[in-house]
Amino acid sequence: MKSLLDEMQQCKSIKDCIELALVDAYGDDEQATAWLTCIEEMFGRFDRVKVLGQEVALEGFDLADGVAVIAVCRQGKRRARVALESVEFPDLTPIEARWLKAWKQFSRGLG
């Protein structure tokens, strides 16, 4: 049986990514949780990202208001929950870039 990450890496288009993310996800809560799971799988390898041009530690991902995937970041003693759209991931692979575009498209209501 394929792992979720293996299946995610087989997606050839943004539409494929969105369809895979939302398989068996009904309602806003389930869709948000499904996206959170996919984002954690695809971007869990990153421990450093940029927010507003500053390098910060990426501690993980979470949901805001139950519907938006956010990044949990830390710089020194300060911790922030940041919209995923505001996070710059270094050296994205083409599939990672595709999944990030898919999330952005879906989160803007275009998916």
Enumerate the language-model features and the residues they cover.
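Short aromatic-glycine-enriched beta-strand elements
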Residues: 65-72
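Short coil-to-beta-strand transition motifs
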Residues: 47-57
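Glycine-centered tight beta-turn/hairpin loop motif at sheet-sheet or coil-to-beta transitions
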Residues: 51-53, 75-79
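Mixed-charge, Lys/Arg-rich low-complexity intrinsically disordered regions
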Residues: 1-46
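Long, low-complexity intrinsically disordered regions
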Residues: 3-4, 21, 97-111
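A short macromolecule-binding patch
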Residues: 78-88
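Residue-level recognition of beta-strand microenvironments
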Residues: 59-61
